[in-house]
Amino acid sequence: MENYFQAEAYNLDKVLDEFEQNEDETVSSTLLDTKWNKILDPPSHRLSFNPTLASVNESAVSNESQPQLKVFSLAHSAPLTTEEEDHCANGQDCNLNPEIATMWIDENAVAEDQLIKRNYSWDDQCSAVEVGEKKCGNLACLPDEKNVLVVAVMHNCDKRTLQNDLQDCNNYNSQSLMDAFSCSLDNENRQTDQFSFSINESTEKDMNSEKQMDPLNRPKTEGRSVNHLCPTSSDSLASVCSPSQLKDDGSIGRDPSMSAITSLTVDSVISSQGTDGCPAVKKQENYIPDEDLTGKISSPRTDLGSPNSFSHMSEGILMKKEPAEESTTEESLRSGLPLLLKPDMPNGSGRNNDCERCSDCLVPNEVRADENEGYEHEETLGTTEFLNMTEHFSESQDMTNWKLTKLNEMNDSQVNEEKEKFLQISQPEDTNGDSGGQCVGLADAGLDLKGTCISESEECDFSTVIDTPAANYLSNGCDSYGMQDPGVSFVPKTLPSKEDSVTEEKEIEESKSECYSNIYEQRGNEATEGSGLLLNSTGDLMKKNYLHNFCSQVPSVLGQSSPKVVASLPSISVPFGGARPKQPSNLKLQIPKPLSDHLQNDFPANSGNNTKNKNDILGKAKLGENSATNVCSPSLGNISNVDTNGEHLESYEAEISTRPCLALAPDSPDNDLRAGQFGISARKPFTTLGEVAPVWVPDSQAPNCMKCEARFTFTKRRHHCRACGKVFCASCCSLKCKLLYMDRKEARVCVICHSVLMNAQAWENMMSASSQSPNPNNPAEYCSTIPPLQQAQASGALSSPPPTVMVPVGVLKHPGAEVAQPREQRRVWFADGILPNGEVADAAKLTMNGTSSAGTLAVSHDPVKPVTTSPLPAETDICLFSGSITQVGSPVGSAMNLIPEDGLPPILISTGVKGDYAVEEKPSQISVMQQLEDGGPDPLVFVLNANLLSMVKIVNYVNRKCWCFTTKGMHAVGQSEIVILLQCLPDEKCLPKDIFNHFVQLYRDALAGNVVSNLGHSFFSQSFLGSKEHGGFLYVTSTYQSLQDLVLPTPPYLFGILIQKWETPWAKVFPIRLMLRLGAEYRLYPCPLFSVRFRKPLFGETGHTIMNLLADFRNYQYTLPVVQGLVVDMEVRKTSIKIPSNRYNEMMKAMNKSNEHVLAGGACFNEKADSHLVCVQNDDGNYQTQAISIHNQPRKVTGASFFVFSGALKSSSGYLAKSSIVEDGVMVQITAENMDSLRQALREMKDFTITCGKADAEEPQEHIHIQWVDDDKNVSKGVVSPIDGKSMETITNVKIFHGSEYKANGKVIRWTEVFFLENDDQHNCLSDPADHSRLTEHVAKAFCLALCPHLKLLKEDGMTKLGLRVTLDSDQVGYQAGSNGQPLPSQYMNDLDSALVPVIHGGACQLSEGPVVMELIFYILENIV
């Protein structure tokens, strides 16, 4: 395999070199210089230049090299009467008849006409559907920063349609209006994005009669209908249009009485690249005789190239005729919204508010090239002009759009001559006027569409145009998850080169990236496997299958009806790792699409009117202006504006300006609120980032960091982000994330991708609760809030009577009906909105107070428009109960820190019902102080986040009035609980909430694996508790101190003692000295547990101390090694250094690191001693030795804090050894021979005795004993098993950080600890010591996966701490699981059996001798960010 990748790397480099040489010969230097510049620094307001359009002429390239154009469409026609339209506008339902999807596939461009004539029936073609004067036209909306090929498709409509229902037009969850869904089309070089979309109007009638009917004489009573486009089934293929043809329906009459374009047919236009790199575009025309049209029709003029007209503050739509029209346009431009054009209504229909919000660009997809000689020369910009613009554009890439426009105006006559030439050439080929299905295409072909000018003759008003946000459309054949779909992506017969696969993909991604701010949204209804479309045809299984394939992350194979395409599809294999991903020559890697905020950080913001935020195209910038005129009229309810996922958008933009919780700044990157704004179960806002291997930017093309732009040098190295493939410096690419395509292994990612991935993970966890089953404890979840009639219509059972929903009185609980609380209170919530007693919180009450109901509550956009996606209606905005605004749709309480800046965190108040609490938001300092001063038996409980509580009480501790802060929830992240006793200040009237913030910081650190233990520390980075001199906390365990009247958590726990900044070096280097010094200061043994603010520091400058020789006070590179459990006992003429036998390895490490002439080590606090040495620094900076002891107890054993053996004593000195007390430790001077003997004894784990005194003395002065004693069992004090309450004291345990963690239904189950209850160390039970780790990991993973479906129910039942005891013995293999001292209920055991039994039996096979009994501890948490 390595040889294969090496060969592939060599071949790829060779191909790249040859390609660059060919480029040098055939492409101008300008293109070569800017090739990677488009990747490294793409212009944010212009399109990437397309070198494939360098020469556009009439010659045709070989058919084999021409890419195929695949148009996917699913047309739905809905004939509506005027009454039905009004009914729909008022929030009711109207019908929608989905048509069977058709698609054309043509493998040979030459034989296209013959294939169309021979192989396709009337129903298989793209039909031109004409409607009456009341029809609304279509407007294709193009993103202003994408190379786009627009293909507007009109479909025929026959009576063989499946019956379905159009849901409420104003229902924001409705996905039935699939107007203008974009299907991506690819050409070979993939430098132009091609997508087709249209909103088609047709009537449900026989198409044969429709062919014969004069399109201008249709009855006016016909209701308007909308054909909604969505991807077709892979098994029903139609409408393949050859890319070498540009068909244009050029017969447009002029009828002053008709203001709407009566017919529009778009066939295909594509710019294709031949084998020689020169594109050939051939334009054909489907001619419709003038006899079919009555009168003359005004031809609207599409003008391309107005500079900056795509910006919100720019020209937008230019009007050249009526002053009234000009004022209308100016109004729309001031409001920052594109103008909705509406035809004249001769019968006086009151549809005058037809305004929609859409993207920045307006391109009418109903454009008919007038073939008559009577049309004005300067008012028509035909497709030939478009091609001419393409020619000039490709000849000079530096030419701006404004220059292009001017150049086209100058060459207008030449353009029309060329157009006539094209029309004459293409006219004989396709003159079937009876086919009824012609298509007209507009080739964007790399042009930077910066403006759209629409004008018409004096006799006509503007045509009706419906705008659709282009940002909601997917380009390049990607679904809403960014995955390439084989049914949409084009696979050329001539496979692309590797250079195409590697480099041009990156160019496409960068040129598109500006327009992707809104495409990463929800996939829609989860019932259709997360597809982005709500299938309107309930009986068409093939369509469902295709929708599933289209939105799936793994490209699926097309159906049997397209065997040729199936044969040409390459197999997708995603490589990863290496400097440049190796890939087959026919594979195009999928580019991870970042979020908009990812792009905001990635590229500098634009200046001027070219605003960076793509969501600003929805008109949020100036939504407040002219909002009354911009709101869509109710009469347009049947022509709703929907995005890719079928969500209705029109009322959102209309009302967002009036909703304070949604009023975001126009340049805010947080404007990407599309999915959550409608209460729909949104998916994570990005997809392929980290899921597929990115295309790496070559080192040679990245001289600077792509974030901070620091230049790379010999010392400043390049680092590739494993998620996006870009090149960054070490500081910008220093984080790590688990990437899916690397089997969830941690890899280096840039800070931008890290933020995106973390947000997306939180998004995914947050939204996972929306697909839960109803809670059996609450019947309200089984009752729908959708009116019965709408349910019937939505299910298609219109002919059957509406269902009757009967609920017994009193079954549904409504907290709002309870007695009013005397003050503002809230229910305790979980992230999914379930109360501890299983009741679902009432939405109205919760939203009023800031909590969320079950699932994801949506924001109600209008009091009269119910949001049916929420289990209960929401009537007010959702704001975080701490006062800050959270992201719309996110569960309240999911933030890491719920402490407001200007107040206190929420308080839990017991309601008297077991398991039920009320939540008081922003309690006042006065009321809190009053309750605390009253001194009730129970403490106040503050909510710091959904998993962390803090209990507060004022206590009297050792005759001191103190605040007592206690945490609850630290155990779940592997951290001991924290207790802080803070002495109250005189007349203190405010609760010191800095303690809360520090608790949250400790929780964050513990999540990252950084926990504090006994004699550990945490420091402050800023002023704390009103003083910058407060340096941090020193954490100690309680020994001899009094714990009376304190609020204590479940063991284990630590006490935090406030220390000063001058004391922080000792907390880092030698914390036991600081602890004992505090005890000496306050005359408490061994130290006080309370903290005193603004006290004098106990240590100053380090000065002259022996510790300067043993530890590094300057850089903290080394400290005095401390062996856990080692103590020093000092008695009369006897000093004992006791080393626990189970700390042999630690002792060896300390000895091996020490100098050969010096052996030193720190000691632990000796609980068996009744006194201890203390080092005190006086005012002169000198260190003195004192001793503290237990009050009223005689001193027998005195402890010391360290020992030092020095081998510098010479035998000529006359001493065997010398011992002395230095500061708070013992120093022993021995000879070099004795030092060697001591080290050898320690290695052999033997006791060693040193005799001190003169060599000729009759009696020795003192003995120094180095002893190996029993194992250190001073662990797990007070810990009991959650399975059966068994004490876990003295049992060895291991904390687990970054271990197994699984998320489901808004909950997280974490494996935090493992105890080894029985393990015979002398007998190696497992074949390898690492087997312990592997076995426990496998068991933990199986346990978590088995309980994931039950996490919600377990937490509701109070079983948040779970234990799993596994026994592996020769005669017994099994497990026990329990919580709260009881075994788990039987309902969970079946899943555990199937998951654990295979793993445990597999581990039992590794046994050799002796039993293994281990207990794993798990916690169930809320998923917080």
From Swiss-Prot:
Residues 202-225 have a biased composition (Basic and acidic residues). Changing P788A: Diminishes complex formation with SMAD2. It comes from the Eukaryota. It is found in: Cytoplasm; Early endosome membrane. Residues 767-823 are annotated as: SBD. Keywords: Cytoplasm, Endosome, Membrane, Metal-binding, Phosphoprotein, Receptor, Zinc, Zinc-finger. Zn(2+) 1 binds at C705, C708, C729, C732. Changing V805A: Diminishes complex formation with SMAD2. Residues 230-245, 296-312 have a biased composition (Polar residues). A zinc finger (FYVE-type) spans 699-758. Ubiquitous. In the brain found primarily in the cerebrovascular smooth muscle cells and reactive astrocytes. GO terms for molecular function: 1-phosphatidylinositol binding; protein domain specific binding; zinc ion binding. GO terms for cellular component: cytosol; early endosome; early endosome membrane; intracellular membrane-bounded organelle; protein-containing complex. InterPro entries: SARA-like_C (IPR022557), SARA-like_SBD (IPR024608), SARA/endofin (IPR035438), SARA_Smad-bd_sf (IPR037145), Znf_FYVE (IPR000306), Znf_FYVE-rel (IPR017455), Znf_FYVE_PHD (IPR011011), Znf_RING/FYVE/PHD (IPR013083). The modification Phosphoserine is found at S306, S668. GO terms for biological process: endocytosis; endosomal transport; transforming growth factor beta receptor signaling pathway. Early endosomal protein that functions to recruit SMAD2/SMAD3 to intracellular membranes and to the TGF-beta receptor. Plays a significant role in TGF-mediated signaling by regulating the subcellular location of SMAD2 and SMAD3 and modulating the transcriptional activity of the SMAD3/SMAD4 complex. Possibly associated with TGF-beta receptor internalization. The SMAD binding domain (SBD) interacts with the MH2 domains of SMAD2 or SMAD3. This is Zinc finger FYVE domain-containing protein 9.
